[in-house]
């Protein structure tokens, strides 16, 4: 079973994911070209890479889904989704936007996926984003 956590920025997705990983959920990491935030680690939160490498994965058709937000790429490796597809008895967890979640459901199969949308007030999200130095009025 794959649990996909989705929600707006600073809604608490990473906190929930980290707690479930402690309870034997296997994390499925997205690739991203953004810089790590304070406290984030390669291989624990994301697979951090550069645009050139990400674009080469796209050209080689190794990514199942990808998004670009500004100059930052996010994506999921087909090989990771194949592992989930062939091991439905294991518990996996990942964070995606709604569009990415829909793409992954199409690939893995709806019966193998549970999507949880985390809804938090904008005031709380702004406070959290300010704490992690990731708040600007333009983004909100």
Language-model features, listed with the residues they occupy:
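Hydrophobic anchor at the beta1->P-loop junction of P-loop NTPases
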Residues: 5
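P-loop (Walker A) phosphate-binding loop of NTP-binding proteins
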Residues: 8
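Walker A/P-loop
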Residues: 13-14
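The feature captures the helix immediately C-terminal to the Walker
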Residues: 17-18
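Post-Walker A helix-loop "phosphate-sensing" segment adjacent to the P-loop in P-loop NTPases
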Residues: 22-30
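ATP-dependent small-molecule kinase phosphotransfer cores
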Residues: 33-92, 98-99
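Conserved phosphate-donor/acceptor-positioning beta-strand/loop module used by diverse small-molecule
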Residues: 91-97, 109-130
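Small-molecule kinase domains that catalyze NTP-dependent phosphoryl transfer to phosphate-bearing small molecules
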Residues: 101, 131-140
């Amino acid at each position: 079973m794959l649990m996909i956590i989705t929600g707006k920025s600073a809604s608490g997705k990473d906190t929930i994911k980290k707690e479930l990983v402690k309870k034997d959920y296997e994390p499925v990491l997205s690739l991203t070209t953004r810089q790590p935030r304070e406290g984030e680690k390669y291989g624990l939160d994301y697979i951090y890479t550069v645009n050139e490498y990400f674009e080469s994965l796209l050209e080689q058709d190794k990514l199942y889904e990808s998004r670009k937000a500004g100059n930052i790429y996010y994506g999921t490796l087909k090989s990771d989704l194949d592992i989930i597809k062939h091991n439905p008895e294991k518990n996996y967890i990942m964070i995606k936007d709604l569009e990415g979640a829909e793409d992954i459901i199409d690939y893995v199969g709806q019966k193998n996926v549970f999507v949880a949308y985390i809804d938090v007030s904008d005031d709380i999200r702004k406070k959290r984003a300010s704490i992690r130095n990731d708040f600007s009025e333009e983004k909100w």
